[in-house]
């Protein structure tokens, strides 16, 4: 097993230098278009890899209303995304991709990418963050991410101990969203 940059992984796959690869968007869609067969993904593996918004703790504690307002704006965008057909988002997504990554994004691949990634409404997020009686789903996901990065030596065991329970993933500010 070799840890490589996604572009290098895709090149190795295209050159038949490997038997299996781990890719994420957009590279997984490019590989699929070139004949790759997906053996598993985050869903079939029973895991999650959510978008994580991180706030500076001191700022968030000092200005909880502003922090919640930011989340409210983000969640309005999520709601708009969920209500808009993916086909109507392609051009804007391609523009974003070109700006962010510096590359063009094929229309069909951009559509697959938009359709593949889940986004969660406020109500869904409150459910995912509910830690009543047990670690929340998000805390479990974050714990799995920490364990993965520890296992491939991207973070040390000491660093992993700081985040391995996922308890930093909290619904405190989500509950303040109006």
Task: Describe every region a protein language model picked out.
Residues 1-5:
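Short beta-strand-to-loop elements that line the ligand-binding cleft
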Residues 7-102:
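Pocket-lining segment of extracytoplasmic ligand-binding domains
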Residues 138-178:
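Conserved C-terminal helix/tail region of periplasmic/extracytoplasmic solute-binding proteins
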Residues 41, 56, 121, 165-173:
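Helix N-cap / beta->alpha transition motif
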Residues 62-155:
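Secondary-structure end/capping motifs
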Residues 19, 29, 44-46, 72, ...:
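Residue-level signal for the start and early helices of compact helical domains
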């Amino acid at each position: 097993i070799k840890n490589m940059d996604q572009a290098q992984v895709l090149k190795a796959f295209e050159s038949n230098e490997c038997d299996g690869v781990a890719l994420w968007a957009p590279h997984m869609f490019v590989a699929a278009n070139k004949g790759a067969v997906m053996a598993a993904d985050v869903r079939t593996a029973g895991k999650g890899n959510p978008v994580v918004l991180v706030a500076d703790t001191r700022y968030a504690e000092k200005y909880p209303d502003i922090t919640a307002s930011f989340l409210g704006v983000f969640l309005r965008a999520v709601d708009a995304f969920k209500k808009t057909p993916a086909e109507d988002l392609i051009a804007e997504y391609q523009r974003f991709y070109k700006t962010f990554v510096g590359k063009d994004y094929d229309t069909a691949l951009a559509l697959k990418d938009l359709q593949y990634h889940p986004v969660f409404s406020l109500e869904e997020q409150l459910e995912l963050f509910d830690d009543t009686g047990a670690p929340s789903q998000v805390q479990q996901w974050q714990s799995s991410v920490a364990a993965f990065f520890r296992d491939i030596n991207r973070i040390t065991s000491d660093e992993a101990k700081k985040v391995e329970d996922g308890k930093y993933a909290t619904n405190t500010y989500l509950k303040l969203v109006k």
